[in-house]
Amino acid sequence: MSMDCLSYFFNYDPPVQLQDCFIPEMDMIIPETDSFFFQSQPQLEFHQPLFQEEAPSQTHFDPFCDQFLSPQEIFLPNPKNEIFNETHDLDFFLPTPKRQRLVNSSYNCNTQNHFQSRNPNFFDPFGDTDFVPESCTFQEFRVPDFSLAFKVGRGDQDDSKKPTLSSQSIAARGRRRRIAEKTHELGKLIPGGNKLNTAEMFQAAAKYVKFLQSQVGILQLMQTTKKGSSNVQMETQYLLESQAIQEKLSTEEVCLVPCEMVQDLTTEETICRTPNISREINKLLSKHLAN
């Protein structure tokens, strides 16, 4: 049993004295099945005296432990099977100038102060239970406030760097905007203008204007001569109101004229004096008769 106790404390790297291995302030509870024998001391008194014949010999050592002990060290007792009748209060095992005794490893103890030591050369990392490590403090820093509004494009700072437009550029933009608006309106007036691009629409607009001028002249001539029945006038008005017929006539660069009026034009002296006009009128009449 003494070898077991010594081998436990000699696992440390530095040499440890047995008196340093004693644990003061340890709450020990000795079970009824264990017994301990110590050297007699005047100040220690037990309720039951040790018998002289059961006292351990001071010259008895374990052969294995002899090499670790000096003659000045304490002697470890040999325990017997003697049983104490009652549990003794061992609080009187406090640090004293006298050497202390080691007890059997089968005792029970309170683990709260298990590694406390009064020896200043023995470092106990778990003894000082009142030590509280200081919490790590970090320097406080303030996070800048960011705007939650998301702006697409240039920000407020970019507005100051935006180049200013000259008066000529502003006027040119205004002209282009007005041209685009007028072109859109013109496309609504020309028959089939929504199917044309800008260049084709301008050409169709020029032809449509010529068609309107010619058609208006024929209608005025019909009113002055007052030739033709009312049915012809109504039929002519009905045809000219159609957008499809206007688109067809303007594309072919012709106008609508009643057949009776064409026949009357052949008898006019002014037309007969102009061979080109007379020739065109004869072609129209020949086509009409062929149909």
UniProtKB/Swiss-Prot annotation:
Residue span(s) of domain bHLH: 163-212
Predominant cellular place of this UniProt entry's protein: nucleus
SUPFAM superfamilies per the UniProt record, alphabetical: HLH, helix-loop-helix DNA-binding domain
SMART domains: HLH
Listed GO biological process terms: regulation of DNA-templated transcription
UniProt GO cellular component terms: nucleus
GO molecular function terms attached to this record: DNA-binding transcription factor activity; protein dimerization activity; transcription cis-regulatory region binding
Tissues with expression: Expressed constitutively in roots, leaves, stems, and flowers.
Keywords: DNA-binding, Nucleus, Transcription, Transcription regulation
CDD domains: bHLH_AtbHLH_like (cd11393)
Subcellular location(s) per record: Nucleus
Subunit text: Homodimer.
Protein's recorded name: Transcription factor bHLH53
Gene source species: Arabidopsis thaliana
